[in-house]
Every structure is written in structure tokens, then in C-alpha cells.
Curated annotation (Swiss-Prot):
Protein name per its UniProtKB record: Putative septation protein SpoVG
Keywords recorded for this protein, A-Z: Cell cycle, Cell division, Septation
HAMAP family (UniProt xref): SpoVG
Cited NCBIfam families: PRK13259.1
UniProt record, GO biological process: division septum assembly; sporulation resulting in formation of a cellular spore
Species: Anaeromyxobacter sp. (strain Fw109-5)
Family matches, as PANTHER family: SEPTATION PROTEIN SPOVG-RELATED
Keyword DNA-binding assigned: no
Family to which this protein belongs: Belongs to the SpoVG family.
Free-text function comment from the UniProt entry: Could be involved in septation.
Length: 97
């Protein structure tokens, strides 16, 4: 399985930092992953649905640690790129010579 596209949608909330959509093998889309700032740093939360008892159940999730870690690395790298793009816009009229 290859993550062929990652789209990051930053939000300005205390713990929720972004929503993410990924495409797998150019043929399967997973929406509503979240980049969360927790006690030990950033992590990825899988899309989930609230149950009648108030708990949450993942809609989709990796079946093993290796896949979860690969997804997390790929998504957080794209999140960092997106922040750098938005955090340091170049002033109008400047260019590198």
C-alpha cells in the first residue's frame, strides 16, 4: 500500500491542528484524519464515529504498527511542509537572484 496523495487542511485550535485526506494507491480516499497536539507531541487520529454511549469507534485504521508509523511519518511530513508554506510567505515583488 502506498500513500499517493496527502492533503492537509490546517485549523487554528488548541489541540486539533489539521484535518487530513489521504489517497491510497491512487484509488482509495480516506477523509477526516486529524493531526492532534497531545501531551507528547503531534499524532494522527483516525476518522471515527461517535456511538450512542458517547464513545468513539474508528471508521478506518491501520491493522499493524508498521503501517500506522508509515502513515504518521508521511502525514506529519506533509503537515510540516504545509505549515512552512503558510508560515513564511514571501513578500510581493521579491525574488532570488
Amino acid at each position: 500500500m502506498e500513500i499517493t496523495e496527502v492533503r492537509v487542511f490546517p485549523v487554528n485550535e488548541e489541540k486539533l491542528k489539521a484535518y487530513v485526506t489521504i489517497t491510497l494507491d491512487d484509488c482509495f480516499v480516506v477523509r477526516d484524519l486529524k493531526v492532534i497536539h497531545g501531551n507528547t507531541g503531534l499524532f494522527i487520529a483516525m476518522p471515527a464515529k461517535r456511538r450512542k454511549d458517547g464513545t468513539f469507534k474508528d471508521i478506518a485504521h491501520p491493522l499493524n504498527t508498521e503501517t500506522r508509523e508509515r502513515m504518521e511519518r508521511t502525514i506529519l511530513a506533509e503537515y510540516d511542509r504545509e505549515l512552512r508554506k503558510g508560515a513564511a510567505p514571501r513578500p510581493t515583488g521579491t525574488h532570488d537572484d
